[in-house]
Amino acid sequence: MLYFLSVGRGGIQVNIFVYTKSKCPNCVVAKQLLKSKGLKFIENDMDTESVRQAFHFAYPDVKQLPQIFINDQRVGGLAGLQQALKDLGL
């Protein structure tokens, strides 16, 4: 998969959105992984009705959480995140 990155002061900048739900062990691991790499991300809580409805409208076939998007590209769940970070050299 190709990730479009912008290079700014201080190196590579990525926009990361993580869709999570409480009591989701893989969500916790994904967030810990991003934090351990020093990457900032925006968390979208699927326990919130409006977030859940908007997500399922855009991605009706996706049932697994977490769901991670890097620079507007869906990388999938935890395994997808791990592969994306490896591909990016992070």
Q: What are the functions of these language-model segments?
A:
Residues 1-13:
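Short, Lys/Arg-enriched N-terminal segments with co-localized hydrophobic residues
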Residues 12-39:
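Local sequence-structure signature of Cys/Sec-based thiol-disulfide redox active-site neighborhoods
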Residues 25, 50, 76:
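Short alpha-helical
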Residues 28, 53, 83:
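Alpha-helical elements of the RecA-like P-loop NTPase motor core of helicases
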Residues 42:
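Conserved beta-strand positions in the Rossmann-like core of class I SAM-dependent methyltransferases
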Residues 45-62:
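Thioredoxin-like thiol-disulfide oxidoreductase module
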Residues 59-68, 78-79:
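Structural micro-motif
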Residues 70-90:
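Non-catalytic, surface beta->alpha helical segment in thiol-disulfide oxidoreductase systems
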